[in-house]
């Protein structure tokens, strides 16, 4: 930047009109203007219906009409940059989960995330020019102190009006922050981020705020600009609108939110007086008429605009827009510029790259630099509301009901989404997706990441598996796993597995009665009930290895076939169902951390399945005492097919929900679940729903049953292409599409989602090397591809 002589370099401070803070949230400019800035989180838009977005646009236009004043200007900035806050330190119980988290961060996320930051700036100019601020601390300026006070009061009133109207957008007013006894100006940091596309702390100084911001050298040329820092340099280029789109719509510039490189989008809007606005419209109309312009429609629209302006349907303002993109070298810059230009052209604008005006265009990005604005144009507040929508991709939450976010995913915009398992304090989650889409892998990944919430709280995870799909995760994290068998001793022997307690007595009485009555031949007599109670008492007084259903049966009468003893006979060892609950050993060992049960072979055996569920849930119930607890169920539709099992599960889940518990369910098609009364009830209670792409998705099931919006249904059925490795997360607080692409982590996928051949291969390794994960897991992950079908 050359000075007036043309031979010396002009100081960047010339372009930085910021004197300093007059309060924590207000900054004084050299021309006497004052400004305040806010960071805007932004509203989710990707899956919003058009009606909602149009309503927000109308509300924003109404706000602009309410604050319209020719001494007020608004700046809106979008800064897309790679300064993404790191994930919090993660602590796990098992080495596998820690390794999984680290690999996911490094292979899937590292270097692939960008952040979108919106900023809103309000500037109030003085009613009368006060002269240069450096001459302001004089007697003349002291006479104007009352004007500054009124100006500040006006700005505060504006801020409160704007903050109230845009509360849902997540506004946070920037001010002064303290870190390690040093004060930093957030306004200065935001201005520097707008200037450079990089975040750098800016301390509060006693001198000029502008001077404290300009610490890197900016060199502007016709082909672009260069920013030189002490450690590196990078280049940029700026694009502006030569002609505006014929029409505007909400979020029309959101195409920039997902570009894979840093950029700064700047827009300013300075309100015009009503007379100035009418003059501009009248002048344009007169020019077209006097030149014989045949664009009758445009002339008519100008007349309509004058009527709308007179009716206060909108206000007019001087608008300026520029897009600055950055790259490490000129070759990359040219490629990025072409892509950005195409995106803007797709929005309907005629875009031009700045050349001679590069220097002015660069400095015009900063709030208050009106004189450097290139190609300003008059637009309506409705147009401005469409161009500046303050929409963004959801960023999730850094903390929730159980502490820090347990995982970070990548959104469609390449931005981070921090995942917490709860919506408010409700941890009910349902995962839907056709077979082979990856829902089991995602479910087990979440279970592994949940170790962070459990490790210091004595929390526990219990999962009901299908076809041993989650067995390897359970074993890799040091848990216990039991695959229940059919036709051979199942592994369940309640009389041998329960301790001699009052709770065990009560449970066994109800459970044995249910076994007897499962034949559908009615209840048992009071006498038989008394004999049963005595028998249970006697059995539990024995050592566990001496207990059996066959021994209990001896306490019941050897009477007719309709008697309780005869009806219990089939459940005794050596009889038709003796294998189910009267084996030599009860293999239910609840791990204090994670336990898995595979009931695949019992699901179609109604009588056995319901009784097995009752026993398992009784054992598990001891862990549901207020500590953190997670119950997971893969392919849970299969469990709903058994009414007795479903009834047992429903009763148990009520206990889970009341005692700080979580539930994660996974199944293929929602319509199968919604057909069940319990299934529909469970899904309704799931505040978090996760959907995988489904080209055959049933409209009624998704929209009527699962309450998806039209845009969400469209994403599930069409937009999320099969094989894209994306899922849609739906919550009341907003929906988002995230990537879960583990193609660079195939050895971990082999553990998260077991197949018949990989499970057998792991069995072989464990038989030779032992069950401790440290003995077999690393070899399995290195050789899993050797597994034979």
From Swiss-Prot:
<keyword id="KW-0732">Signal</keyword>
<dbReference type="InterPro" id="IPR018145">
    <property type="entry name" value="CagE_TrbE_VirB_cntrl_dom"/>
</dbReference>
<keyword id="KW-0192">Crown gall tumor</keyword>
<dbReference type="GO" id="GO:0005524">
    <property type="term" value="F:ATP binding"/>
</dbReference>
<dbReference type="GO" id="GO:0030255">
    <property type="term" value="P:protein secretion by the type IV secretion system"/>
</dbReference>
<dbReference type="InterPro" id="IPR051162">
    <property type="entry name" value="T4SS_component"/>
</dbReference>
<comment type="similarity">
    <text>Belongs to the TrbE/VirB4 family.</text>
</comment>
<keyword id="KW-0067">ATP-binding</keyword>
<dbReference type="InterPro" id="IPR027417">
    <property type="entry name" value="P-loop_NTPase"/>
</dbReference>
<feature type="signal peptide">
    <location>
        <begin position="1"/>
        <end position="38"/>
    </location>
</feature>
<dbReference type="Pfam" id="PF03135">
    <property type="entry name" value="CagE_TrbE_VirB"/>
</dbReference>
<dbReference type="InterPro" id="IPR004346">
    <property type="entry name" value="CagE_TrbE_VirB"/>
</dbReference>
<feature type="binding site">
    <location>
        <begin position="433"/>
        <end position="440"/>
    </location>
    <ligand>
        <name>ATP</name>
    </ligand>
</feature>
<keyword id="KW-0547">Nucleotide-binding</keyword>
<comment type="function">
    <text>A possible function of virB4 might be to provide the energy, via hydrolysis of ATP, for translocation of virulence proteins of the transfer of a T-DNA-protein complex across the agrobacterium membrane.</text>
</comment>
<keyword id="KW-0614">Plasmid</keyword>
<protein>
    <recommendedName>
        <fullName>Protein virB4</fullName>
    </recommendedName>
</protein>
<dbReference type="GO" id="GO:0043684">
    <property type="term" value="C:type IV secretion system complex"/>
</dbReference>
